[in-house]
Amino acid sequence: MRFVQYSVVIAKPPEMVLAAFTDFNHLKNWWGVERSFIELKRGGLYSLVWKVSPDTMGFVTTGIIAEYLPACQLKIENLVYFNPQRPVLGPMELMVLTTPERIGTTLTVVQSGYKNGPDWDWYYNVVKDAWPMVVLKIKDYLENVGD
């Protein structure tokens, strides 16, 4: 099964690093999320929306929180991606792990569950190319924002 995994060390505590994926203000500031609905509990919804206009919502990622351990891990199952130019893609899994280090926190992001076919190949390649830039964007954002 194909998966995408990237890690980066961030000079911030684990709880702040994980909050970058759960707090709307952080999501808005580093990832450009325009709307979110997140229930931080097992079985809770995790939904992010980008490119909102008066007529439509551009891109939506949504799933079910399978595990949430503050300052440690966020596991989202049944992750589905909506793109107006593509078929709905899912279900997948997204795992966000934080590991305390002497100099901060290692953030590891793993996205898995990619199927086969042209749209899946397109999405896998987009995500494979995007996550390295995304984790560096998180690092830059968090290391330049106050605790």
Positions of the model-derived regions?
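Hydrophobic-ligand binding "helix-grip"
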Residues: 36-37, 56-104, 112
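Conserved catalytic core of Hanks-type protein kinase domains
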Residues: 20-21, 68
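Aromatic-glycine hotspot motif
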Residues: 2-14, 52, 66, 99-108
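Generic short beta-strand segments
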Residues: 45-51, 77-81, 110-114
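Solvent-exposed alpha-helix faces
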Residues: 22-23, 136
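A conserved amphipathic terminal alpha-helix motif
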Residues: 113-147
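Short beta-edge strand/loop motif at the mouth of beta-sheet-based domains
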Residues: 5-6, 25-60
